[in-house]
A protein has these predicted regions:
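Flexible, compositionally biased loop and terminal segments
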Residues: 1-277
Length: 277
């Protein structure tokens, strides 16, 4: 399958105006240490930050307005060396003159007071400076989860209510959402898994675009089946035949350029779908 076919498959079913606000991917960045063979952890986290920027820029170019990103959970905070490396990678590479950043609104969610209490006062001030800071043209919003936990979220539901409904969790290297569940915001959320990490050097713009379109297409085709779906007899028979009796699964080969081979696994109505490129 060509990227143009995937684009047509996804976007022919919708108008961007209809879903520009309601399609909100949740980017769960991961794999920067184990995937950074050949360069330091610091370079790995920098690569993760650059992937985040590129993903957001492409998402915005496609016409969408918001995304949610997990930086690190509160559980990660126990590893001081790791946290210090993550924070350094962010502050050293955050450029408020960057056109995409300059035209974005940042909203921060998590226990940021712990940074001040544990010797990271400069980073604490950095987060305060960017949180809800008016931008030149607030046509894209980043919802940033940092030092986040479900326990913090339950105690701060008023803040959590500012996060939009999550359409798709995009998880890298690991097939679970650990420490990153967002209460009341994940009622119709699909799950997308990338086998390779969110390391910028591993991804072309074309492959990031494919990741976004796969997430969009799966969300559109499955969200009506979550919780409130009423099945007619023909639907029951068709799904039962394909999913239960045939154990249906699909593999789609994408003809796109990418520095690394990858497998993206999604879950359709009839079974898993593996996109390989």
């Amino acid at each position: 399958m060509l990227l143009s076919e995937l684009t047509h498959q996804s976007l022919s079913k919708i108008t961007l105006e209809k879903y520009s606000n309601s399609f909100v991917p949740y980017l769960y960045l991961d794999g920067h240490r184990s995937g950074s063979n050949g360069f330091s952890d610091s370079e790995g986290y920098k690569n993760g930050y650059m992937f985040f920027l590129r993903f957001g820029r492409i998402l915005k170019q496609l016409g969408f307005k918001q995304m949610v990103t997990m930086v690190h959970t509160q559980r990660n905070f126990s590893s001081k060396e790791r946290i210090g490396t993550i924070l350094k990678a962010i502050t050293n590479n955050f450029d408020d003159k960057n056109e995409f950043i300059k035209n974005s609104l940042f909203k921060i969610y998590g226990d940021i007071d712990s940074y001040k209490q544990n010797g990271y006062s400069d980073f604490y001030k950095f987060l305060l400076d960017i949180n809800n800071k008016p931008s030149m043209n607030q046509n894209f919003t980043h919802h940033i989860l940092i030092n986040y936990s479900e326990e913090w979220a339950l105690k701060n539901l008023q803040k959590i209510n500012c996060i939009p409904e999550i359409s798709s969790v995009i998880r890298f290297t690991k097939g679970f959402v650990s420490g990153g569940w967002i209460p009341i915001k994940m009622q119709t959320t699909s799950f997308i898994y990338s086998q390779i990490p969110s390391i910028s050097e591993f991804w072309s713009d074309e492959s990031i675009t494919a990741l976004i379109l796969i997430s969009l297409n799966i969300w559109i085709t499955t969200k009506e089946f979550i919780g409130t779906k009423s099945y007619c007899q023909n639907e029951k028979e068709m799904i039962h035949q394909k999913r239960d009796l045939e154990l249906c699964s699909d593999t789609v080969k994408l003809e796109i350029q990418c520095p690394m081979h990858n497998r993206i696994i999604a879950f359709g109505i009839n079974g898993p779908i593996s996109y390989e490129f």
